[in-house]
A protein has these predicted regions:
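Catalytic cores of RNA-modifying enzymes
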Residues: 1-212, 216, 244, 255, ...
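C-terminal lobe and adjacent flexible extensions of AdoMet/dcAdoMet transferase-like proteins
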Residues: 198, 216-271
Length: 271
């Protein structure tokens, strides 16, 4: 069905938008089944050629808000609806022709389903985890597997920064591996579908102060944590006292601290 849609509507991937179309119908079905859809508020980000949209509609959500910047794709969607490829009856169905980083969800406790290109992964995660007023309940995101590896394995300092700002807000697990052969055109890298389940464990920790601490702590990743903090205009004696209070070794490296300790450090250091 997915390949038929591409052929019927003469859809071509745009390199400028980093488009790779998932054409394995079984995987599309699996993605649509990761979280509960029926009578829920769903936001689909960058639907592109609407194969997943069709599956979501079949599961009868309460509302389905699509966020798509590509005008050509929106025109194709309208054609598919006009041709009765699928019906949107009894669904609060909206198309938002807007940059996703400017999109502000109105509903509460919604789920996000998204297909995110590599270059905008971090900005989109930050937008929905930190910037929007109404946060999602969970997010199902198809992304390049090397991004998932960075979040999971933290093999470079930039990966630690990404992982920490995610861990503060949610638990992450790999829901599905997607081989590159399932896309048209096939990308160079395999993909994964990740499930982000938001929690409120650290909601009492100020987001702005936490992110500021992380930025300062990782400003020179080859240095010890204490040196980075002192070089960021924190008083050395204050830092040592805080480390002692939290039972942190004075010469600890940033990769040795877990998210709970980072949150404690953020709270105390900014008193």
């Amino acid at each position: 069905m997915s390949l038929e849609i591409l052929k019927k509507y003469k859809i071509r991937a745009k390199k400028s938008l980093w488009q790779n179309f998932l054409v394995n119908d079984d995987i599309v079905e699996e993605i649509s089944s990761i979280v509960d859809i029926e009578w829920k508020d769903i936001i689909e980000v960058w639907p592109w050629y609407w194969a997943l949209t069709e599956k979501l509609v079949e599961k009868k959500p309460k509302s389905l808000n699509l966020v798509e910047l590509d005008n050509d794709m929106i025109e194709i969607l309208n054609s598919r609806i006009k041709n009765n490829d699928f019906t949107i009856e009894n669904i609060d169905f909206n198309i938002n022709n807007i940059d996703v980083l400017k999109y502000e969800p109105e509903s509460i406790g919604y789920s996000i389903i998204a297909n995110i290109p590599y270059y905008i992964t971090s900005p989109i995660l930050r937008h929905f985890l930190y910037e929007v007023g109404n946060k999602p309940k969970d997010m199902v995101i198809l992304m390049q597997k090397d991004v998932w590896d960075k979040i999971l394995w933290k093999w470079k300092w930039k990966s630690w920064v990404l992982s920490l700002f995610i861990e503060k807000k949610c638990n992450v697990s790999e829901a599905l591996f997607v081989a590159k052969e399932n896309f048209v055109p096939a990308p160079k890298i395999e993909s994964s579908v990740l499930l982000f389940e938001l929690h409120d464990v650290y909601n009492d920790i100020n987001d702005e102060l936490f992110l500021d601490l992380i930025k300062k702590a990782f400003r020179e990743p080859r240095k010890k944590l204490i040196k980075n903090l002192v070089n960021s205009w924190y008083n050395k004696e204050l830092i040592i006292n805080i480390f002692n209070e939290l039972s942190i070794d004075e010469w600890v490296r940033w990769e040795d601290l877990d998210i709970a300790t980072w949150c404690q450090l953020s709270t105390i250091i900014n008193k």
